Amino acid sequence: MSLLQIAEPNQSAQPHKHRFGLGIDLGTTRSLVAVVRSGKAQVLPAKDSTDTLLPSVVYYPATGMPLVGHKALAHLPNDPQNTIISAKRFMGRSQTDIKFSHPYELSGRREDMPTFVTAQGEVSPVAVSACIL
């Protein structure tokens, strides 16, 4: 990652004192967000947590909003069909390409990227990733 310094004409070319950059790592199993302020990197804690690593997991209950991270992971043992983990492994692949074991019911044409069938309906791997972000 690099930072680009932009200055108005006739202003100092010196870098400003308070530069800011943001980075997001959407990992297969864990995700994180970090900021760079004045040249120092800091990993931010997940919402409602002191942990900086957020499990890349989304739980889709029959009613209500999807749960993300540790709250979603707690539902994995009892409801694996509606608890989506490692959604990135399904991105950019057709159902024909998916050779690994998983607990999900998949929908869609065999030659297209699948969608997960959940209690809240069909959800694409891209939509699961968007919930994590």
Region roles according to the model:
Residues 1-55, 60-133:
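N-terminal phosphate-binding loop and flanking beta/alpha elements of the actin-like ATPase fold
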